[in-house]
Amino acid sequence: MQQNQYIQEIQAQAPHFVCKEVGSDTLLVPLRNNVADFNQYLTLNELGSFIYLLITEGNNFEQIHAAILANYEVNPDEASQDLNAFIELLYKYTVGNG
């Protein structure tokens, strides 16, 4: 599955990013020379933060999907589609900034 390859590449880039909580959102901020670059950041809602944490903990697509179904009231197909879209967004943001 291509998504698991994307997840592995996002995991490899994780040390180059920092998460900063701002209100109910989390900012995913790239590090440049070990300094947070607040000119470029991705805002994550609660579910996005949950997924990013699961990715950085080494989980694969199937494990993340199962965790979403266990913690949120959502249709499995909808969760899969939304997870696919979010992984692609994270991949473009993290690998593109890496």
Role assignments for model-derived ranges:
Residues M1-A36:
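Long, low-complexity, charged/polar intrinsically disordered regions in eukaryotic proteins
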Residues Q2-Q3, N34-G98:
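Long, charge-rich, low-complexity alpha-helical segments
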